[in-house]
Amino acid sequence: DLLMQGKNVAVITFTNAATDEIFNRLDYTSVFHISTIHSFVWDIIRHHQADIKKLYCFYIEEDIKVLEKKLDETKNKTTKTYFANVEKLKYQKERLTKAQTIEKFVYNPNGSNPEYNALKHAEVIKISAQMINESDMLQRIIAQRYPILLIDESQDTKKELVDAFFEIQKNYADIFTLGLLGDQKQRIYTDGKENIGSIIPNKWEKPRKKMNYRCAKRIVKLANAIGKDIELHAEQDPREDANEGTVRLFVIQQYDGINKD
């Protein structure tokens, strides 16, 4: 029915490898539209060039204001940090001048995007999140085109983008269903939505994966012990035929010369 109406179930994830894996597991069923997060949101906003340009320039202008304030408030104007900020300010002003001449922004989800009119990966997420969050038209387009949207690794998805998708769910609950797939214990990036489980409405279904098919018994036991402080009632059980496994703790002497960045 969805295909006959020109609609799809959208599944968005982080990497091309994950996209290929999901395609394979779903046996390339055409009702599913599977893509990376960057590809998905770029496809939504790419025709709205004027809005992209407006936000692109706005973010640069905000960076310029911050840098100018830093420079004005710097008392010691002979430090490396001061001169680095001077160069950053010069660079941002040059970017703004070039940006005002751009007629069309481009973006390649699989490339480095070196062109002066090409958006960087982080810029696509930032711009699209704000555009979707503020535009009823874009929300309606997503809801009508993808009545079911599943976010893989939702615990690491940029929080502004998660907020935008929640806005669609709130405004178009009668035709749009949002699904979050992920594990708070596996959260890697700090710019993801913190404690995402706490913002999920009570009326949502909350299926849990109780069986851990992959790990040895001791690994599951350790993960449960660590995870209880992160997410309540998220314990898993190992397969009955799983290996007992081994957990080792390594203690090393700290070396101050290590680059922790």
Language-model features, listed with the residues they occupy:
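Short helix-terminating capping/connector loops at secondary-structure junctions
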Residues: 3-7, 141-144, 173-175
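A polyampholytic, Gly/Pro-enriched intrinsically disordered region
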Residues: 52-65, 228-234
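Accessory N-terminal region flanking or inserted into the helicase ATPase core
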Residues: 72-150, 159-164, 190
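Conserved RecA-like helicase ATPase core segment
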Residues: 164-243
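Conserved RecA-like ASCE P-loop NTPase motor core of nucleic-acid helicases/translocases
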Residues: 4-18, 32-34, 181, 209-211, ...
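Short, surface-exposed amphipathic charged segments that create phosphate/polyanion-binding patches used
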Residues: 46-55, 221-226
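Phosphate- and divalent-cation-binding pockets in alpha/beta enzyme and binding domains
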Residues: 21, 43, 141, 160, ...
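P-loop NTPase Walker
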Residues: 1-52
